[in-house]
Every structure is written in C-alpha cells, then in structure tokens.
Amino acid sequence: TEREQIFLDKVESPKYHRDNVNGLFPFFENKVPEEMQGFYTTSEIDALRILKDTDRDVEKRMPVKLTKHYFEVAKKSKAIQHIVKATPNETNDLDGSEDPGFQMDYSPVEGLLHKYEMGLMYVVSTCSAHCRFCYREELIGRKEIERADGTVAKKGMAKIPEIISYIHSHNAIVAANGGVHPETGREKLREILLSGGDPMVLANSKIAAWLSALAEAGIESIRIGTKEMAFFPQRFDESFLTMLDRFHETYPQVGLRFMVHFNH
C-alpha cells in the first residue's frame, strides 16, 4: 500500500560492527584479539580440539559465536562465561530427536509455527552470540529435521509473501466459520512473534518490512524476541528507534512489544 511504501522509504539501515569471533578455530590458533586470549584455558582448548571432526565435535552441534561486548561482560563472571563457552559435555549424550517438541507438525508454511493462538516465525537462523544452552540448536546448527510428511530438510526461514498469504487465508476461513477454523479449532490469528535466531541481527529495512507487512495483513500484536540488548546493546540506536516511532505513527492500531532475554 502507499502508506507502507512511505514508511519503508524512510527507514535507515546502518551497518553494525559487532566484532564477532566466529567458531573455535580463532581460539585454537590464538588468532583472537589480544584482550580475548585466555578466554579458554589451555586445557579447555585441548579438550575441545580432540573432539574436532568427530561425532562429538561441539561445533557440529552448534557453532561458537561471541561478540566483543559480551566478552567484556563475561570475562568478569565465570557464570556468564558458561553461557557462551563451549565444553565437551555438550556432546556427551546426543540421543533423542532434533525436534523433541514436534514443532514441524504445526508448521503450515515454511518458517511459521502455528500451534497455539499466536504464530511464531523463524526470520533468521543466527544470533549475535550463541548461548550454549540454546533449545533451538537444530536451527542455529542448520540441522536436517524430519517433517510430518516424512521428508527430511533443514528448517526454512519465513518469507513475507508466503506468511502473509497464510494469514489472509487462515483468517478468511475463520471469519466464514463463526470465528473458529473448522479443521484446527484455532481462532483468528492476531499475534505474531518474530524469532529465530535473533531478529535484531537483521537490518532495519528487513525488520521494518516484516512489521509493515504483518500490520497490513491485519495482525494486531507483534512481539520481537531478542537477546541483542545483552549481546550488542549498541544495536538499539537512533536509526532503529526512529524507525519504531514511524511504525507507530503509521500503524497506531498495532501493538509492538520486545521480549528481552537476559541471564542473571
């Protein structure tokens, strides 16, 4: 629509420099910045190196990732270090399903979970840093998952055209059947949670595109789940906040909430 295009045309998308360390290799080869050397002890590095390229390789389970900002926080606390430091214990027991919650049984469109009243979307498959306890390691690690129809593939990311088409279709069927979908028993889809991964690693333009598309489709409440406030708080800058202000001005009827994750 015209109002959507006017909103999107004003979005600024600066580049952000998180100074990430990606993977264990920089720690193995001591190629991390000088101030980050020693984050893993020699014995910790040796224990992880032995597992490399074996079935118990911790990065086959989920890649290691760390921002400079979170390193500065973690270096002061052993407890916080455990959140992002890989250990051999992660792969002691690899039994079980990659989809223990059977989420794929409730995915009518790639990248969307619609099990309950609200919908949850995977809009990105990474975060600024990776918590080692992450319960979506199959998504972060890009693992193949068995679908309800028996096919096996990696979880796909949500795409705007497919999601918007599903919202319109679902809500039209609900409206035509007394407020309840005749097959699933679900009511009108009013609320969407943007998740992943962390939506805040996306550019402002991509976040804005999701927000406006969902608003135009009649979604009444949008939530964004993020740990970026802990990993890289500089992401919440003037350009991003200005975009949010303009979104509220353009779509005052839509509630927008941030679900901010911290460990403490």
Can you name each region flagged by the protein language model?
Residues 71, 122, 261:
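Residues in well-ordered beta-strands of folded domains
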Residues 84, 88, 235-236, 240:
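Solvent-exposed, flexible loop/coil residues
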Residues 99-154:
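Glycine-rich active-site/cofactor-binding loop and its immediate structural neighborhood
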Residues 136-239, 247-264:
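Core AdoMet radical
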